[in-house]
A protein has these predicted regions:
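Sec-dependent N-terminal signal peptides
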Residues: 2-13
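Periodic aromatic/glycine/histidine/acidic cluster detector
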Residues: 18-126
């Protein structure tokens, strides 16, 4: 089984100049990792997005980063393309809505996270 992982390191062209300085491809036999590195002027590299793919080429997950920490709405999908999860992060911690779905498209769990902890009412669907 080969998994495709594409990690993109991007910088806002409005604030910083973008220059691809290196591209790599790694294979461990189980998956392939594609890496693109962007220079943030003289201050190093910044990762802003990570994409993973199922062996059939369907996107498995899409994760966003800000200042090196997971941030924003992150999603995952099943091999058939149906949604599997939507998690909200803020500065590296779970913060906001947290929803998971069964592979048949029905919700399995729904709740809210605050600073990495469950907050309020959580609903489990059977």
């Amino acid at each position: 089984m080969i998994k495709y992982i594409s990690i993109s390191l991007l910088i806002s062209s409005v604030i910083f100049s973008q220059e691809i300085i290196h591209t790599e491809k790694h294979s461990t036999g189980d998956y392939i990792i594609y890496l693109e590195y962007y220079r943030k002027n003289s201050r190093g590299l910044v990762k802003t997005k990570k994409e993973t793919y199922h062996p059939n080429g369907v996107m498995s997950s899409e994760l966003f980063f800000r200042l090196g920490k997971i941030h924003g709405l992150n999603r995952g999908w099943y091999e058939d393309g149906s949604i599997g999860f939507e998690y909200s992060y803020e500065n590296g911690k779970e913060n906001g809505s947290w929803i998971e779905w069964y592979s048949n498209g029905q919700k399995s769990i729904e709740g809210t996270m605050k600073n990495g902890e469950r907050d309020g009412l959580w609903t489990h669907y059977w």
